[in-house]
């Protein structure tokens, strides 16, 4: 029996030791669970609270404890007893409640407790220093049992809070370091944008940038020789607000604006071709085709000199887009080649926005208004077509009507070769062709016909009846002249009389312009055709004679 009793006592003792060991489990999870919420509650008595000068110190705490015990001993002689309390230890700190009323007497947070001291003379007494700077207090407490478990719980609480705080700070530091790394990375990118090495445009100092159309895209890139790997590329995002658009490109010399056309000083200078758009000089003013497709349809021969389309020759599509379509205009600069584009360009069939002059009004609508020197045909000949100079007109040099009629018949027979829809082909233009004299006689006679009234069977779509060319009764009729149409030629005697009456007019035309084409004589206000002074169709045989000075004298 004794042995069984001893075994039972041993089991109970071991169970108590196990329970104590379980109470001594001070893992982090256990401590968190222990101090969570209200925490651990202990029964005690409040010895007293004393103000101290410092936040910590064993000597300081021991002196304060002895002082408070002396006060309690004096009160006990008077019959007063210590206040019974219970205190709780939690994450919120130390709370002291009145045992009788349960009211909260004192609350000291963990961060306010600066020092914990144990009484070496009494194992049930301990104290702690708390308060803020300049207001420190020492609280002395006497526990119902040993004060060591309370002190250990306070130590564990402070250690746990310290570790949790340290871990939180490490996490915050790690997150902050990560943010700092991102900020540093972003700062590096921003500094690279401000760095002149990584500018979009890099120019050498003191040199103007060379704009090459083929390598223009390569200019606006970061130089590959100074480009770092991947990370330091110029970002595609918007620049920083502190960096303006000009600061982004650095000190850049702005190239001159070569695309804007210069402002014309005078109306005459507006149509002078620039160095990049100079038209090739050609003696063949009207080009390979007598008239541009967009200006005058095929088969039409207008009265007077037909103005070619201003943009008949289109060397480049870009030139037409920049300058825009203009109505037919001819400019003659002093001492320069007449500016007119009669040649068909790369795109002769392009529809022009401005309608041509020949199709807007009847051919004779403005004939009576051309009273003084219209000179449209002479403007297109210029100094580059030096034909035979017409001498002064006089009665001795003018041929008689009898010699003029055979020439008219021969010219009419020559003109019959051109009754077709398109004019005859012209030899290819060469730079050494000085004038129309290099072409065939038939081709020259075809152009001499421009501005002269035609027969109705000449594929002319104009209404001949609208031309105010009334035949004048001849004062000296000739019996040998064949019957000629009235619109083609008036009476030779009337023309001779008109020349004889006003010889100064011909001299002005001959001295001022020296042009082989005198189409203004066909556009006189009275409608008479002063073409009896020479052959209007030229010499068929191609040999000059005294009577036929110029192949275009009458046209």
Curated annotation (Swiss-Prot):
Q: Where is each PID domain found?
A: 36-189
Q: Which GO annotations describe the biological process of this protein?
A: neuron migration
Provide the transmembrane region boundaries.
none
Where does the record say this protein resides? Cytoplasm
Q: Where on the chain is Phosphoserine found, per UniProt?
A: 491
Per the UniProt entry, what species is this protein from, by scientific name? Macaca fascicularis (Crab-eating macaque)
Provide ranges: composition bias, Basic and acidic residues.
15-26
Name a Pfam family for this protein: DAB2_SBM
Instruction: Quote the cellular component terms of the Gene Ontology held in the record.
Output: cytoplasm; intracellular membrane-bounded organelle
Keyword annotations for this protein?
Answer: Cytoplasm, Developmental protein, Differentiation, Neurogenesis, Phosphoprotein, Ubl conjugation
Q: What are the boundaries of the region Disordered?
A: 1-26, 384-410, 418-437, 468-555
Recorded hits in InterPro entries, A to Z, give:
DAB1/2_SBM, Dab_PTB, PH-like_dom_sf, PTB/PI_dom
Q: Low complexity bias located where? A: 470-479, 487-501
Its primary localisation, in coarse terms, equals cytoplasm
Q: Where is the composition biased (Acidic residues)?
A: 504-513
What does the PTM comment of the record read? Phosphorylated by FYN on Tyr-198 and Tyr-220 upon reelin induction in embryonic neurons. Also phosphorylated on Ser-491 independently of reelin signaling.
Entries under CDD domains matching the protein: PTB_Dab
| Disulfide bonds, paired cysteine numbers | none
Summarizing the function annotation, the protein's role is: Signaling adapter of the reelin-mediated signaling pathway, which regulates the migration and differentiation of postmitotic neurons during brain development. Mediates intracellular transduction of Reelin signaling following reelin (RELN)-binding to its receptor: acts by docking proteins through its phosphotyrosine residues and PID domain.
Its subunit composition reads: Associates with the SH2 domains of SRC, FYN and ABL. Interacts (phosphorylated on tyrosine residues) with CRK and CRKL (via respective SH2 domain). Interacts with DAB2IP, SIAH1, LRP8 and VLDLR. Interacts with LRP1. Interacts with APLP1 (via NPXY motif). Interacts with DAB2IP. Interacts with ZSWIM8.
Domain notes from UniProt = The PID domain specifically binds to the Asn-Pro-Xaa-Tyr(P) motif found in many tyrosine-phosphorylated proteins.
Point out residues bearing the modification Phosphotyrosine. 198, 220, 232
SMART domains from the entry?
PTB
Q: Output this protein's name.
A: Disabled homolog 1
Composition bias (Polar residues) maps to 391-403
């Amino acid at each position: 029996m004794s042995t069984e009793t001893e075994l039972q006592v041993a089991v109970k003792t071991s169970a108590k030791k196990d329970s104590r060991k379980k109470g001594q489990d001070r893992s982090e999870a256990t401590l968190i669970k222990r101090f969570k919420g209200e925490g651990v509650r202990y029964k005690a008595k409040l010895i007293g609270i004393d103000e101290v000068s410092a936040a910590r110190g064993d000597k300081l705490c021991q002196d304060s404890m002895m002082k408070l015990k002396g006060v309690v001993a004096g009160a006990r002689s008077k019959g007063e007893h210590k206040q019974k309390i219970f205190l709780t230890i939690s994450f919120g700190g130390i709370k002291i409640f009145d045992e009788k009323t349960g009211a909260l007497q004192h609350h000291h947070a963990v961060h306010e407790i600066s020092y914990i001291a144990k009484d070496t003379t009494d194992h049930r007494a301990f104290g702690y220093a708390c308060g803020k700077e300049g207001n420190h207090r020492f609280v002395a407490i006497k526990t119902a049992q040993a004060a060591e478990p309370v002190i250990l719980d306070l130590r564990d609480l402070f250690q746990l809070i310290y570790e949790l705080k340290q871990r939180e700070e490490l996490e915050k530091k790690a997150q902050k370091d990560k943010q700092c790394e991102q900020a540093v990375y972003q700062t590096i990118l921003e500094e690279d944008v401000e760095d002149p090495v990584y500018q979009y445009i890099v120019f050498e100092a003191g040199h103007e940038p060379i704009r090459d159309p083929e390598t223009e895209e390569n200019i606006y890139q970061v130089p590959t020789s100074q480009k770092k790997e991947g990370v330091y590329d110029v970002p595609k995002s918007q620049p920083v607000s502190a960096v303006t658009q000009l600061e982004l490109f650095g000190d850049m010399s702005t190239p001159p604006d070569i695309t804007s056309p210069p402002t014309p000083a005078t109306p005459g200078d507006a149509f002078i071709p620039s160095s990049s758009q100079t038209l090739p000089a050609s003696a063949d003013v009207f080009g390979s085709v007598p008239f541009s497709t967009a200006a005058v349809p095929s088969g039409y021969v207008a009265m007077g000199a037909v103005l070619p389309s201003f943009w008949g020759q289109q060397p480049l599509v870009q030139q037409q887009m920049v300058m825009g379509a203009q109505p037919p205009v001819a400019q003659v600069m002093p001492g320069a080649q007449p500016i007119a584009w009669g040649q068909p360009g790369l795109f002769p069939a392009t529809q022009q926005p401005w309608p041509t002059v020949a199709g807007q009004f009847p051919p004779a609508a403005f004939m009576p208004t051309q009273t003084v020197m219209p000179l449209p045909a002479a403007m297109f000949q210029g100094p580059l077509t030096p034909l035979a100079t017409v001498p002064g007109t006089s009665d001795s040099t003018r041929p008689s009507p009898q010699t003029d009629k055979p020439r008219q018949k021969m010219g009419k027979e020559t003109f019959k070769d051109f009754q077709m829809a398109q004019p005859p082909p012209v030899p290819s233009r060469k730079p050494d062709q000085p004038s129309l004299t290099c072409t065939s006689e038939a081709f020259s006679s075809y152009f001499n016909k421009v501005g002269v009234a035609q027969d109705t069977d000449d594929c002319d779509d104009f209404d001949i009846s609208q031309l105010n060319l009334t035949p004048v009764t001849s004062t000296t009729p000739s019996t040998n002249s064949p019957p000629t149409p009235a619109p083609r030629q008036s009476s030779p005697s009337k023309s001779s009389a008109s020349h004889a009456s006003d010889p100064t007019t011909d001299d002005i035309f001959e001295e001022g312009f020296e042009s082989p084409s005198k189409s203004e004589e066909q556009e006189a206000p009275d409608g008479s055709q002063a073409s009896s002074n020479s052959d209007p169709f030229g010499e068929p045989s191609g040999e000059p004679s005294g009577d036929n000075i110029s192949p275009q004298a009458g046209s």
